[in-house]
Amino acid sequence: MPTISMFYGIIIRMYREIGGQHKVPHIHAEDQGEEVVVSLDGDVLEGSIPKKKQSLVIGWVNINYDELLANWDLLEKGEKTFTIEPLK
């Protein structure tokens, strides 16, 4: 499960889910054992993390949409993802 970014204790991962339940491009954000799945459109698909951190994740997704979509395209081709600048 490739880590594509980390900020404020949040780990952002993106991986290919063959036959998975989420049919849209998305990321997984983990914070202290809790996880939220967020589409690249910024919609929460599943789970939750503390509200303030979830807002940071959604903002980060919006800022980095193009890079995230490029990573998703790489995954679809079976290629390796690249890291994305964290929030500062």
Language-model regions, residue ranges each:
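Glycine-rich, flexible loop/turn motifs
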Residues: T3, L45, K80-T83
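Short, charged, low-complexity patches
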Residues: P50, Q54-I58
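Intrinsically disordered, low-complexity boundary segments flanking structured domains
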Residues: M1-P2, P25-I27, A70-N71
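C-terminal structural segments of small proteins and small subunits
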Residues: I58-K88
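Broad hydrophobic/π-residue packing in well-ordered secondary structure
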Residues: I10-R16, V37, L69-L74
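Short, charged/polar N-terminal "headpieces" of proteins
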Residues: M1-K23
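A short, structured beta-strand/loop element
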Residues: Y15-K51
